[in-house]
Each structure stands twice: as C-alpha cells, then as structure tokens.
Amino acid sequence: MESTEQPRNISGSMQSPRSPSSHPYLSVSVTDPVKLGNGVQAYISYRVITKTNLPEYQGPEKIVIRRYSDFVWLRDRLFEKYKGIFIPPLPEKSAVEKFRFSAEFIEMRRAALDIFVNRIALHPELQQSEDLRTFLQADEETMDRFRFQETSIFKKPADLMQMFRDVQSKVSDAVLGKEKPVEETTADYEKLKHYIFELENHLTEAQKHAYRLVKRHRELGQSLLDFGKAVKLLGACEGEPTGKAFSDLGTKSELLSIKLQKEAQQVLMNFEEPLKDYVRYVQSIKATIAERGTAFKQHCELSETTKLKEINLDKLMLTRSDKVGEAEIEYREIKAESEEATRRFERIVKRMEDEIVRFQEQKTEEMGVAFHQFAKGQARLANSVADAWRSLLPKLEASYSV
C-alpha cells in the first residue's frame, strides 16, 4: 500500500507538493502490517516509509521494516535521553491473546504507531535525535543489534551503581529516621500535577463512555440484522401487499444494520481511539513528572551533602589535619556533582514548561477534530436512520389500508 500522506514541515503544517524543498520536512508513514512466524513466536512487521529533505538523512526516501519492539526501543531511548520532554505514548499490547492478530487490533495498532512516530518526527527536539535517524534508516540486522544491546544487563553498569546508591540511601534514611520523601512544592508544580491527574480522570471517563457507544452501535446493528431476517421470514407467510411491505421492512433493517456497524467502526477509530491515546499520553507525562521528582530529590540531597562536606573541610583546616587534602578532593567532586544535578533539574523544569504549552495546543486541536468527527458522524447516522424509516411509512400504511 503506497502512502498518500503529504510531507509535513518541521512545524507540523502540511507541505505543498509543488514545492517539496522550500521548507525542511520529515514525514513518516507506518504501513502494510504483515504477520510473521507462528505460535508464540509470531509477530507483526510494518513498512516504515520516511520522506525528507533534511541533510542529515541518507536520501529523500527510505523504506525499512520494523516490528513493535523496535518502536519500544525508540521510545525507551528517547525517554532516557530527553528528560523533561513528554515522549509520545505507544499503543499497548493486547491483553487477550486471541485478539493479538485480529484485523481490527492490527489496524488500530498500525494507526497508533504511525501517530507515535510522526509526533516524534514533528517535535523540534526529538526530530533531531540520532536514535530516530537510526530507527528510520538502519537495516533490520543493525536494528536487532541495537535492540539486543539495549536489553543486555551489562549494557548499563552506571544504572546498576545508581540502583545500589538508591538502596544505600534508603537504608541510611531509615536508620537515621529521615524517611519523609523530598518533594517539590512550588505553586506552579502543584498546579501542573493537579491538571494532569484531573485530565487523566476525565479522559478515562470519556473513553469509557465512548467504548459503550461503540458497543451500543454494534449491538443495535446486530439486532437490526436479526430483526430484518425475522421480518422477511414473517413476510413470506403473508400475502400481498403485507408480505411485500414486511420484506421491504426487513431489507431496510438489514441496510441500517450495515450503516450502524460502519458508524461503530468510525466511532472506534476516530473517537474512542484518540481518547484512549490521550489517556496513554497523560500517563507518559506522569512518568516525566516522576523523573522530575527524582531529579529534584538528587538536587536537594547532593546540595545538602555538599554543605556537610564543606563544614567537614572547614573543621579539618582549622585543626590542620593531614586529611585536608583528601577532604578537599571529596568536596570538589561532590560540589561538581551537585552543580550538575542542579543544572539537570533546572533543564527538566524549563523543558516541561515548554512541553505543557505544546501539549495543550496539540490536545486542543486533535481532540477538537475527534469531537467534530464524532458529532458529524452521529448527525449523518441519525439522518440516514430517519430517512430510511420515513421512506417505509407509505408502504406500511398502504399494507393495512387495503
């Protein structure tokens, strides 16, 4: 299946096909899902088509094959490297094995993966990522090697040391009675957290009701189909004109059943799925908030440790201790760590300030489109249903007026 999506420039607006090189653009399409393998080893592969005029890419178009775990690799790499940025969410795996390879699930996941990678490609910082270029251009063997290295426990010894330090710190806090967590309490930060947690609740509730709407449309469609068949059989037992009227009623019910099933699919893809996507997005933002909390804690703890080291150094200098040299080295090292932790925390805060504005603008636009499509679809369905039943009235009236 050939992609028909027009290139987008890096600000996210549509690029004119007549002047593809007038502005920098990076457009990605996730297409052609194919099931590979059997049993528990089975998975879906996708063609990822990249079109760009950015000089750091290998050419104007590149096609690679990717699987879900490759998208996970990209998300994890970006989350690790771009602290403070709201990394777009991935669609979740199917919790029910029998639905893993259903046509509906595969299409929903393909669409969600397409949204995921294009959000990254359109982000002013993320679109410059070396990992994104690797994901969009590397051959399958290279991609497998990167993914394997990422999952190896020996890949990140620094992470293991950090885990050890965290455990050591928690044990020390417990012994010293300092178990109360260090938390940021500024008014802006509290306002942000309140907004995100409230937004998650409201989106989750809206998505739950959208799911019920899809279910209701499908059930009503099935009921109309069953009713149409039953009325046709009933009409076959009747003479004219009643039999013909019943047959027309059954046919019309079956046609309306098809319309309801189609509308159910539209509500699912264009309304429920965008709501579900934004629930995942908010959960991704909560992960960034947690990272900010960790950075703030490190900033505070290292700042406190630096003060203690400075006090200890001053005492040793007063007593002319032979440990002054060693203490001075320790103080300089911990001070450098503290300053880096402060810069890291401040960078996260600044990024999040920019990100929340960007997120709200994006949410307003995308949710506005979703609600507009939903309302338009419901109006169209209501008109179709009313017209269908209205067209039957003269025939039904004639059947009992004879």
Curated annotation (Swiss-Prot):
Record localization: Cytoplasm; Endosome membrane; Prevacuolar compartment membrane; Golgi apparatus, trans-Golgi network membrane
Compositional bias segments (type: Low complexity): 11-24
Domain of life: Eukaryota
Coiled-coil ranges (or none): none
Domain BAR: start-end pairs: 160-402
Residues that, per the record, bind a 1,2-diacyl-sn-glycero-3-phospho-(1D-myo-inositol-3-phosphate): R67, K93, R109
Domain PX: 24-143
Keywords: Cytoplasm, Endosome, Golgi apparatus, Lipid-binding, Membrane, Phosphoprotein, Protein transport, Transport
GO cellular component assignments: endosome; endosome membrane; Golgi apparatus; intracellular membrane-bounded organelle; membrane; multivesicular body; plasma membrane; retromer complex
InterPro entries, per the entry: AH/BAR_dom_sf, PX_dom, PX_dom_sf, Vps5_C
Disruption-associated phenotype: Shorter primary roots, fewer secondary roots and an altered root gravitropic response. Accumulation of storage protein globulin 12S in dry seeds.
Expression sites by tissue: Ubiquitously expressed.
GO terms assigned for molecular function: phosphatidylinositol binding
Residue span of region Disordered: 1-25
Phosphoserine: residues carrying this PTM: S16
Database matches in SUPFAM superfamilies: BAR/IMD domain-like (SSF103657), PX domain (SSF64268)
Bias type Polar residues, positions: 1-10
Primary site of residence: cytoplasm
Domain notes: The PX domain binds phosphatidylinositol 3-phosphate which is necessary for peripheral membrane localization.
Record's function text: Plays a role in vesicular protein sorting. Acts at the crossroads between the secretory and endocytic pathways. Is involved in the endosome to vacuole protein transport via its interaction with the BLOS1/2 proteins and, as component of the membrane-associated retromer complex, is also involved in endosome-to-Golgi retrograde transport. Required for the auxin-carrier protein PIN2 sorting to the lytic vacuolar pathway and the trafficking of several plasma membrane proteins. Also involved in the efficient sorting of seed storage protein globulin 12S.
Sequence similarity: Belongs to the sorting nexin family.
SUBUNIT field: Homodimer. Heterodimer with SNX2A or SNX2B. Component of the retromer complex which consists of VPS29 (MAG1), VPS26 (VPS26A or VPS26B), VPS35 (VPS35A or VPS35B or VPS35C), VPS5/17 (SNX1 or SNX2A or SNX2B). Interacts with BLOS1 and BLOS2.
Name of the protein described by the UniProt record: Sorting nexin 1
Gene that specifies this protein: SNX1
